[in-house]
Every structure is written in structure tokens, then in C-alpha cells.
Curated annotation (Swiss-Prot):
Family affiliation: Belongs to the protein kinase superfamily. Tyr protein kinase family. SRC subfamily.
Pfam families given in the database record: PK_Tyr_Ser-Thr (PF07714), SH2 (PF00017), SH3_1 (PF00018)
Protein name: Proto-oncogene tyrosine-protein kinase LCK
Stretches the record annotates as Interaction with PTPRH: 154-242
Record bears the keyword DNA repair: no
Chain positions covered by the region annotation Interactions with CD4 and CD8: 2-72
Recorded name of the encoding gene: Lck
Reactions this protein catalyses: L-tyrosyl-[protein] + ATP = O-phospho-L-tyrosyl-[protein] + ADP + H(+)
Domain SH3: from-to ranges: 61-121
Oligomer status and interactors: Binds to the cytoplasmic domain of cell surface receptors, such as AXL, CD2, CD4, CD5, CD8, CD44, CD45 and CD122. Also binds to effector molecules, such as PI4K, VAV1, RASA1, FYB1 and to other protein kinases including CDK1, RAF1, ZAP70 and SYK. Binds to phosphatidylinositol 3'-kinase (PI3K) from T-lymphocytes through its SH3 domain and to the tyrosine phosphorylated form of KHDRBS1/p70 through its SH2 domain. Interacts with SQSTM1. Interacts with phosphorylated LIME1. Interacts with CBLB and PTPRH. Interacts with RUNX3.
Post-translational modification: Autophosphorylated on Tyr-394, increasing enzymatic activity, this site is dephosphorylated by PTN22. Phosphorylated on Tyr-505 by CSK, decreasing activity. Dephosphorylated by PTPRC/CD45. Dephosphorylation at Tyr-394 by PTPN2 negatively regulates T-cells differentiation. Dephosphorylation at Tyr-394 by DUSP22 negatively regulates T-cell receptor signaling. Myristoylation is required prior to palmitoylation.
EC number of the protein: 2.7.10.2
Main location: membrane
Disease: Proviral insertion upstream of the Lck gene causes overexpression, leading to the development of thymic lymphoma.
Source organism phylogeny: Eukaryota, Metazoa, Chordata, Craniata, Vertebrata
Length: 509
């Protein structure tokens, strides 16, 4: 008999199992016919997994070798095309375009960093997600395209060198959910979820739980589905000629212009905001745009390029589902449960926490300025633009175009905009989310809203709004700006709104 010593003993899961006195790990007789791991020599093996024969170890690949996760068609002067599965050697790693050489053709050029993964790592595996938080794992697995049993393995947020398994499941009370399992490490380099069975590598673990649930909530069906990433913007293309853009479909029109889906240079799908002539100074816009392009975060719409001659064009990443206020009214938006709605709010708070950290101000935070991707990821748009608008109907603050119902009292009365006035607006945005896009202060005109706010009035709790969420709204609507919470606080509360009292991980099977 023998054992494999683990640095993570879990004695309470080992009833009715003989264990080693030193390490408390299961001891299995050589002639055991149970489904426990089989010891051969010094190895513990899974009877449900077919192991590869004993082969000499492969020569380790060099650290600068990558494998293409997707094919790439060159579209710029100096970039390098390649096919999915092709190996490349990285020559220079800087920014979002890396200089590389194809081992297939020998050609050199620049490649998009997000189309490749390190060859000598887990990164090329479709089920492995390197830098993914527990919350984002849930968002990915619950996104359209994934089903019961979809799964991924991610790096542990708290323990370097450890991993977690996240699996999509169905709960009778909660509906579609994601369950998480800690993957524990053995001293000999192996892994286990349940101490009943260990694996020499993560590939073996995945293969086993694909064949049988063996104590998990369900069998693993297929890796979490993700879309081919959008290539990074070519860094030298900032002020671009108007003729490089082809406007294809008008997505909407607002008070200051139109938004179009279009293509840049015939190959890159983008959103183009065309501003009405005279709505802002081109020089002031360019100065602000140069600041805006430095604000890069996964929860902010990426600003790609500008056309600075009037009519001004703002070229950004394209978001398939358009504005949040419109999406919430669609059949897909109406079906969203309160958990998903609050997750959207948490994503917006995360983006605003970054803006807060950068000492920036949005000035026009509302659901119309939040965009939604096809995987229901929310991103903040139009940050900073409001201060440049030169339309009298807007700058007068009482004018017809000014968003009174979203604006903090000190900004309405004195023109004082701070990150705390953005917090007030976020509280209003929360009402839009839980009412699926209803206009705030229903039945009130703008002058009535101003008069009522001066008397201390606050919007009543919307139908189907949890009491705890309404409490959060009321914190955002404190009269004194300094009494309102930070966006970092709002993000933390919304992130854990339904999970604060639940265990983050499933017990060992």
C-alpha cells in the first residue's frame, strides 16, 4: 500500500477511508477494485481516464514561442498574417502589436497580441482562462452561447499557482447558475478536487469529469464559448481622413448627432458618432479626445480615432446590442432577471470606479450612454463629452436638452460637476435598470423635478426593486455630495449583492 502526500488535507471528507498517518491522504490497496485512484508504483491513477503511454518528455519550448489561437489576415503596412495553430517566435513584445516571425513562412511583421498564446503553457487550451476573476467567470459562462455543463479552469485569485473550476449548472430556485470548485495541488505536482481521486495534470482532470460528474454538480460538457477577439487598433491611426470610413447602418440619433455602424478601411467594424456642426469646438474636442483615449479599461468603450474637421466623427469599438436603455426594452432585455440586472449595474460601477481613480468626471451618466455587447457586457460611453457642448439649450441647464432628471442638485443649481454628482446620476441609472428603461420621475416635468428636489423629495422605490438596492439609491441621493458613497464602494456592494452570505466555493465532492 502507499499514499501521495498532499499539502491540503481535508480530514472531514475522509470518513470510511484508510488514510496515511503522516499526511492523512487516502491509502488504496494494490488489489483494490473500487473507483478510488489506483496506485501503480508511486503514482495514483484515475480508472476512468485512459492515460497516454510512457513517452520520453518533450523538449521544452522556448519562452518566446506562441501559438495562434485564431487566423489573422494582414490589413496594415507591416503586419503579419498567420493561420490558426501556426507557431510564431516573438521578437519584440511591446503594447498591443508584437513583432514576430512565423516558423512556417519565416516572414516577420507585427501581430495582434490577443490572437496568440504562449506555446509552453496552458493558455492555448480552450478551457483555460488565464486572468479571469470569479465574477467574470460567471459572466462568461452565463453569456449567450453557453449551456448546462459549460466550464472553464481559471487561475486562483488568492493563491498563486492554484486553479479553480467553474461550471454552468441549473438550479430549480435560481435558474442558470455557476458553481465553483477549488482545484487543490499535490506536493508531487498533481491535482485533485475530491481527495478520493487525483490527477497528474489538468488535462487528465478535465478528461475525467467530462466522462463522469463523479460528485460535481454535472458532467463537463464543453469549454466556455468565447468570440474571436477584435484586433487592437493600429497605434498610428488617430486623426484619420473621413474617406477611410464607410457608414453602413444608422443605429440611432440624439440631440447632438447620429450614431452609425460602419467600417474603417473596409475591414474593421466600428461605431461612428457624427456630431452636428456647431455642437462643440473642434479644437476643444481634440484636446479632450486626447485625454479620453488614455482612459482604457474593460468597462469603458474604447476610443479608436477621430475626424477633427466638422462634422466631427468619433470612432469607437462597436457594441452589438446598442445602448442599455434601448436594450432593456427588447424581448431579450425584458427577460433578464434581477440578478443579471444587478450584475450590469456592478459592471457600470466598476467602470466608474476607474474613472473615479483617474480623477476624471463623466458628467452625463445614464443608461443611454451605456453600451451593451452581444455577451451582455456593459461599457461606459461618452465620458467627458458633455462639458464641451456649446448648445444654449444644453448649457443653460434648464434648457430642453439638459438631462435634468439624471443631474445632481448642485450641478443643476450651480453648475458644480464632480465625481459625486456622477454618483447621484448612478443612483438614477439604477432606477432605469430595474424598471427596464423607464424614464425617471414618471409623470413629472423637468421644472417639477427641480422644485421637488429643493423640498427634499426623492424618487419612490420602483416596483420589483429590492429594499437593499433602494437603500443604495438613497445613499447616492444624499443632499451633501461628500456624504455620497464612492464608486469603489458601490462596485463592491453590487458585486456581492446576492453572494455576500453564500459560500463562494462548492464543498469537496
Amino acid at each position: 500500500m502507499g499514499c501521495v502526500c498532499s499539502s491540503n488535507p481535508e480530514d472531514d471528507w475522509m470518513e470510511n477511508i484508510d488514510v496515511c498517518e503522516n499526511c492523512h491522504y487516502p491509502i488504496v490497496p494494490l488489489d483494490s477494485k473500487s473507483t478510488l485512484p489506483i496506485r501503480t508504483g508511486s503514482e495514483v491513477r484515475d480508472p476512468l481516464v485512459t492515460y497516454e503511454g510512457s513517452l520520453p518528455p518533450a523538449s521544452p519550448l522556448q519562452d518566446n514561442l506562441v501559438i495562434a489561437l485564431h487566423s489573422y489576415e494582414p490589413s496594415h503596412d507591416g503586419d503579419l498574417g498567420f493561420e490558426k495553430g501556426e507557431q510564431l517566435r516573438i521578437l519584440e513584445q511591446s503594447g498591443e502589436w508584437w513583432k514576430a516571425q512565423s516558423l512556417t513562412t519565416g516572414q516577420e511583421g507585427f501581430i495582434p497580441f490577443n490572437f496568440v498564446a504562449k506555446a509552453n503553457s496552458l493558455e492555448p487550451e480552450p478551457w483555460f482562462f488565464k486572468n479571469l476573476s470569479r465574477k467574470d467567470a460567471e459572466r462568461q459562462l452565463l453569456a449567450p452561447g453557453n449551456t448546462h455543463g459549460s466550464f472553464l479552469i481559471r487561475e486562483s485569485e488568492s493563491t498563486a499557482g492554484s486553479f479553480s473550476l467553474s461550471v454552468r449548472d441549473f438550479d430549480q430556485n435560481q435558474g442558470e447558475v455557476v458553481k465553483h470548485y477549488k482545484i487543490r495541488n499535490l506536493d508531487n505536482g498533481g491535482f485533485y478536487i475530491s481527495p478520493r481521486i487525483t490527477f497528474p495534470g489538468l488535462h487528465d482532470l478535465v478528461r475525467h469529469y467530462t466522462n463522469a460528474s463523479d460528485g460535481l454538480c454535472t458532467k463537463l460538457s464543453r469549454p466556455c464559448q468565447t468570440q474571436k477577439p477584435q484586433k487592437p487598433w493600429w497605434e498610428d491611426e488617430w486623426e484619420v481622413p473621413r474617406e477611410t470610413l464607410k457608414l453602413v447602418e444608422r443605429l440611432g440619433a440624439g440631440q447632438f448627432g447620429e450614431v452609425w455602424m460602419g467600417y474603417y478601411n473596409g475591414h474593421t467594424k466600428v461605431a461612428v458618432k457624427s456630431l452636428k456642426q456647431g455642437s462643440m469646438s473642434p479644437d476643444a474636442f481634440l484636446a479632450e479626445a486626447n485625454l479620453m483615449k488614455q482612459l482604457q479599461h474593460p468597462r469603458l468603450v474604447r476610443l479608436y480615432a477621430v475626424v477633427t474637421q466638422e462634422p466631427i466623427y468619433i470612432i469607437t469599438e462597436y457594441m452589438e446590442n446598442g445602448s442599455l436603455v434601448d436594450f432593456l426594452k427588447t424581448p431579450s432585455g425584458i427577460k433578464l432577471n434581477v440578478n443579471k440586472l444587478l450584475d450590469m449595474a456592478a459592471q457600470i460601477a466598476e467602470g466608474m470606479a476607474f474613472i473615479e481613480e483617474q480623477n476624471y468626471i463623466h458628467r452625463d451618466l445614464r443608461a443611454a450612454n451605456i453600451l451593451v455587447s452581444d455577451t451582455l457586457s456593459c461599457k461606459i460611453a461618452d465620458f467627458g463629452l458633455a462639458r464641451l457642448i456649446e448648445d444654449n439649450e444644453y448649457t443653460a441647464r434648464e434648457g430642453a436638452k439638459f438631462p435634468i432628471k439624471w443631474t445632481a442638485p448642485e450641478a443643476i443649481n450651480y453648475g458644480t460637476f464632480t465625481i459625486k454628482s456622477d454618483v447621484w446620476s448612478f443612483g438614477i441609472l439604477l432606477t432605469e435598470i430595474v424598471t427596464h428603461g423607464r424614464i425617471p420621475y414618471p409623470g413629472m416635468t423637468n421644472p417639477e423635478v427641480i422644485q421637488n428636489l429643493e423640498k427634499g423629495y426623492r424618487m419612490v422605490r420602483p416596483d420589483n426593486c429590492p429594499e437593499e438596492l433602494y437603500h443604495l439609491m438613497m445613499l447616492c441621493w444624499k443632499e451633501r455630495p461628500e456624504d455620497r458613497p464612492t464608486f469603489d464602494y458601490l462596485r463592491s456592494v453590487l458585486d456581492d449583492f446576492f453572494t455576500a452570505t453564500e459560500g463562494q466555493y462548492q464543498p469537496q465532492p
